[in-house]
């Protein structure tokens, strides 16, 4: 991966930012740094918590020491974090993300309709119907009949998709609620004024922001460019490195 990113021998004193999940161990973090060093001995590799990069990309003024609340929903995990400036105050990593949502839809459609779906078809249903919350509607999809093993066209209801996603969405909402229940008083005003900001590909799920807002009890919004939020934040950190602490650095 580091070679694909362009961190290879021959570059002149390259610098890079490597974003790591909040749940990454010290061993995993050191291994990443060592891998970067092995590819380019004079490389300046900077490890940064993914939630810090997401918050920077979401427009939080971390340089001013502001408090921030970020929910980063990726393919495999969801990162929920409270930050003060460039420091992670509290974070939680969930094994729930866009892939788990797709799998839940695949399983629900097979159980209810006897139809085998591919991941792309499940993803299309997810993005088109989302969290319908009782709104009637359906979408046509094509899969394989589980019994006959032949192609079949089927209408999938919005209710079925929303029901399939309920477990994943509830887990994210519970994590947000738990994080807010233990927020330091000195950060409360910043978090309320800055709102819960949702990033990552999973943020594009229709209806998700309103569900998170209901769980949080404070306003929530999807950032302007959720798919590139972490990358944009990493670029910001690379350009203004001194403003942001390295991953795992004590905040005191």
Where are the language model's segments positioned?
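Nucleotide/phosphate-binding catalytic cleft detector across ATP-hydrolyzing
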Residues: 1-70, 83-197, 203-252
């Amino acid at each position: 991966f580091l070679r694909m990113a362009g961190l290879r021998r021959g570059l002149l004193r390259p610098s890079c930012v490597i974003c790591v999940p909040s749940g990454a161990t010290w061993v995993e973090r050191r291994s990443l740094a060592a891998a970067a060093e092995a590819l380019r001995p004079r490389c300046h590799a900077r490890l940064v918590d993914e939630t810090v990069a997401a918050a920077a990309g979401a427009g939080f003024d971390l340089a001013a020491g502001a408090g921030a609340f970020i929910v980063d929903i990726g393919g495999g995990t969801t990162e929920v974090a409270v930050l003060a400036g460039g420091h992670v105050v509290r974070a939680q990593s969930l094994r729930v993300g866009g892939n788990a949502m797709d799998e839940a839809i695949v399983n629900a459609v097979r159980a209810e309709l006897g139809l085998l779906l591919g991941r792309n078809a499940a993803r299309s249903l997810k993005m088109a119907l989302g969290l319908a919350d009782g709104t009637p509607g359906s979408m046509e999809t094509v899969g394989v009949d589980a019994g006959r093993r032949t192609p079949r066209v089927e209408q999938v209801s919005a209710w079925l998709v929303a029901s399939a996603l309920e477990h994943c969405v509830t887990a994210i909402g519970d994590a947000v609620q738990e994080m807010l229940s233990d927020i330091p008083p000195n950060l409360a005003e910043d978090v309320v004024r800055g709102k819960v900001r949702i990033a990552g590909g999973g943020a594009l799920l229709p209806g998700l922001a309103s569900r998170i807002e209901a769980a949080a009890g404070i306003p929530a919004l999807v950032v302007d460019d959720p798919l590139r939020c972490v990358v944009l934040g990493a670029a910001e950190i690379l350009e203004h490195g001194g403003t942001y602490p390295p991953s795992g650095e004590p905040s005191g």
